[in-house]
């Protein structure tokens, strides 16, 4: 597969006093397209997608707070609304409207939230496994007492405070860990993602760029009814994508697709959670067909 791509330009912007990073793929006069990565990933996850679409769109891809080359927060404040706010700030500062947005996992949740809050600003939206926890998981969590969830959250934050970033003796060791986490990856993909997702320590070892605190999720129960209300306000054409080999449940089978006014669902065979990596060519075909429908 082709993995060598000419790189984008790096920029910074500020949101809630944080110095956040994004890349710009040029083509300033083309329609705007925003790409938002998932948890513990980074903006260069999108390089192959951006390379394919850059001739037709002005593409920007941010590093979410605590990820990639964006600043870490003080404390452990990595909530959904903060991520959404950061995206709102970036789009507002660049006046990037009307925008087509594509997000993966956490990023897929962020773009759906933003599209429901500001439906008038969105042209089209693609969410790759971005609907949050499956309904069955939400039901199981809601059965657990709030006091127990809070106690476990406090213990988790305390444990994270003593957790040092993992160090890999060589870059190849980090690449191997990347490929272990997603066996679907081509070796060249794994290397590319690792090169852009690590920094080299003073002793020569390598560590992931993301803040370990992004691993911690809110102890408050996922509010499905509020999510459904927000999704119902997404007036732009919406494409929900899922890998058939992923843990994510089918939004048609579990009923969540019913909350979107204008929606299409695509299940990609042979793909796990990272559909845009696992089956890149098929993913691009599906997305291109969807975007060309304008």
Set out the residue ranges of the language-model regions:
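Active-site loop/oxyanion-hole signature of alpha/beta-hydrolase fold enzymes
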Residues: 15, 54, 60-106, 138-144, ...
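Conserved serine/cysteine hydrolase catalytic core
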Residues: 198-258
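Catalytic histidine-centered segment of alpha/beta-hydrolase-like enzymes
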Residues: 271-284
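Conserved alpha/beta-hydrolase catalytic His-Asp/Glu region
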Residues: 162-221
